[in-house]
Amino acid sequence: MKTLYSLRRFYHVETLFNGNLAVSGRDQETTGFAWWAGNARLINLSGKLLGAHVAHAGLIVFWAGAMNLFEVAHFVPEKPMYEQGLILLPHLATLGWGIGPGGEVVDTFPYFVSGVLHLISSAVLGFGGVYHALIGPETLEESFPFFGYVWKDKNKMTTILGIHLIILGLGAFLLVFKAVWFGGVYDTWAPGGGDVRKITNLTLNPGVIFGYLLKSPFGGEGWIVSVDNMEDIIGGHVWLGAICIFGGIWHILTKPFAWARRAFIWSGEAYLSYSLAAISMMGFIACCFVWFNNTAYPSEFYGPTGPEASQAQAFTFLVRDQRLGANVGSAQGPTGLGKYLMRSPTGEIIFGGETMRFWDLRAPWLEPLRGPNGLDLAKLKKDIQPWQERRSAEYMTHAPLGSLNSVGGVATEINAVNYVSPRSWLSTSHFVLGFFFFIAHLWHAGRARAAAAGFEKGIDRETEPVFFMNPLN
């Protein structure tokens, strides 16, 4: 749909200093936006906006493929992934590719294949992006009405929403298919110290799955982040996939109800703000998930969680001092509490000392030593296995601590130690990105609401310094 009049009165007017710099349909006069305002120039050019989005997808997939191959090229099988600064290979390993018992990498070829497939995909997307940005039709409405749209068309917008939901649902089911039929996924809780296995006994009980949503986010409750078995994770993806696909079909077949038409602002910038809010929330949830959860993010690949490293330290010194003759059940610490063991607020036996705050921790290397009332004193005296000692010593020395300059370890560490856990990187980056996306949501939501209310006039530029400068050329 060609616009026959200038859109300047509808947008902030950004003044272009060099008025001669113009590309057809993307200049200051026809769009009201200068070149540096990016995709805002394409608000009413659906064909060109398609090009921008496809090219953006190509950049994302190119990064994934290139970084994947970079990590494969630098990978050392003898060292754990988390010691090598890897953030992509742990995700592939969690999906069960190339992994044997105990999280050991037995084959790096699947990782290479993944990188190459992403690079090839990015080339296809890159070509499509360049084609639609430079050659394809400026608008899709005339030639391809199915792909065309007008931002104000509420029915079309919810149809597009429905298509997106169906694609998301299919993505959730891809994980289900991988876990149930195509080789399984890595389960850190598998007997004998973690292994790749097919998840056959899915949790489909809605009481269990939706019970996570009703839990408190604090302490030992932990909301959805507290999921601690693969059956619940894969079963949850069955539910999510089904809900997304059903919701997508619903949004395609129905028109928005009157209350929805009144409640929402129906403009491109409003949709941008809704998307930013959603992705901000996902960023915050991902931050908590990767920091606290050692089932979806196994410690074999991502390193221990903070609580896990702390509890591992207490366990390591309990083992050492017990060998030296200490009675760990009755030894008293400097505060009068138990030095090695104490009781939690609810009566369970837990590790004593500073790590008492992490008494909720569950980890595959520690659970065998628990009884009905917390840690079992008899098991601690007789049943500790060498693999548990090795695992806890390893995790104790790889706590997810680190600073901005990538010099890792605790403050007392020697300078030779340069270790920053992928958990630190992934949780910090997702928190920061989630925060920025939230600010962007507020910004664009405010602009969209102001524009809809009719008082979006832009900034008065009469006294702007640039007007009093000599031209660059």
Swiss-Prot record:
<feature type="propeptide">
    <location>
        <begin position="1"/>
        <end position="14"/>
    </location>
</feature>
<feature type="transmembrane region" description="Helical">
    <location>
        <begin position="447"/>
        <end position="471"/>
    </location>
</feature>
<keyword id="KW-0934">Plastid</keyword>
<comment type="similarity">
    <text>Belongs to the PsbB/PsbC family. PsbC subfamily.</text>
</comment>
<dbReference type="GO" id="GO:0046872">
    <property type="term" value="F:metal ion binding"/>
</dbReference>
<protein>
    <recommendedName>
        <fullName>Photosystem II CP43 reaction center protein</fullName>
    </recommendedName>
</protein>
<feature type="transmembrane region" description="Helical">
    <location>
        <begin position="178"/>
        <end position="200"/>
    </location>
</feature>
<dbReference type="GO" id="GO:0045156">
    <property type="term" value="F:electron transporter, transferring electrons within the cyclic electron transport pathway of photosynthesis activity"/>
</dbReference>
<comment type="subunit">
    <text>PSII is composed of 1 copy each of membrane proteins PsbA, PsbB, PsbC, PsbD, PsbE, PsbF, PsbH, PsbI, PsbJ, PsbK, PsbL, PsbM, PsbT, PsbX, PsbY, PsbZ, Psb30/Ycf12, at least 3 peripheral proteins of the oxygen-evolving complex and a large number of cofactors. It forms dimeric complexes.</text>
</comment>
<feature type="modified residue" description="Phosphothreonine">
    <location>
        <position position="15"/>
    </location>
</feature>
<keyword id="KW-0597">Phosphoprotein</keyword>
<keyword id="KW-0150">Chloroplast</keyword>
<dbReference type="InterPro" id="IPR005869">
    <property type="entry name" value="PSII_PsbC"/>
</dbReference>
<dbReference type="GO" id="GO:0016168">
    <property type="term" value="F:chlorophyll binding"/>
</dbReference>
<feature type="modified residue" description="N-acetylthreonine">
    <location>
        <position position="15"/>
    </location>
</feature>
<keyword id="KW-0604">Photosystem II</keyword>
<feature type="transmembrane region" description="Helical">
    <location>
        <begin position="291"/>
        <end position="312"/>
    </location>
</feature>
<feature type="transmembrane region" description="Helical">
    <location>
        <begin position="134"/>
        <end position="155"/>
    </location>
</feature>
<keyword id="KW-0464">Manganese</keyword>
<dbReference type="GO" id="GO:0009772">
    <property type="term" value="P:photosynthetic electron transport in photosystem II"/>
</dbReference>
<dbReference type="InterPro" id="IPR036001">
    <property type="entry name" value="PS_II_antenna-like_sf"/>
</dbReference>
<dbReference type="GO" id="GO:0009535">
    <property type="term" value="C:chloroplast thylakoid membrane"/>
</dbReference>
<dbReference type="InterPro" id="IPR044900">
    <property type="entry name" value="PSII_PsbC_sf"/>
</dbReference>
<keyword id="KW-0007">Acetylation</keyword>
<keyword id="KW-0157">Chromophore</keyword>
<keyword id="KW-0479">Metal-binding</keyword>
<feature type="transmembrane region" description="Helical">
    <location>
        <begin position="69"/>
        <end position="93"/>
    </location>
</feature>
<keyword id="KW-0148">Chlorophyll</keyword>
<keyword id="KW-0793">Thylakoid</keyword>
<feature type="transmembrane region" description="Helical">
    <location>
        <begin position="255"/>
        <end position="275"/>
    </location>
</feature>
<keyword id="KW-0602">Photosynthesis</keyword>
<keyword id="KW-0472">Membrane</keyword>
<dbReference type="InterPro" id="IPR000932">
    <property type="entry name" value="PS_antenna-like"/>
</dbReference>
<dbReference type="GO" id="GO:0009523">
    <property type="term" value="C:photosystem II"/>
</dbReference>
<dbReference type="Pfam" id="PF00421">
    <property type="entry name" value="PSII"/>
</dbReference>
<keyword id="KW-1133">Transmembrane helix</keyword>
<comment type="function">
    <text>One of the components of the core complex of photosystem II (PSII). It binds chlorophyll and helps catalyze the primary light-induced photochemical processes of PSII. PSII is a light-driven water:plastoquinone oxidoreductase, using light energy to abstract electrons from H(2)O, generating O(2) and a proton gradient subsequently used for ATP formation.</text>
</comment>
<feature type="binding site">
    <location>
        <position position="367"/>
    </location>
    <ligand>
        <name>[CaMn4O5] cluster</name>
    </ligand>
</feature>
<keyword id="KW-0812">Transmembrane</keyword>
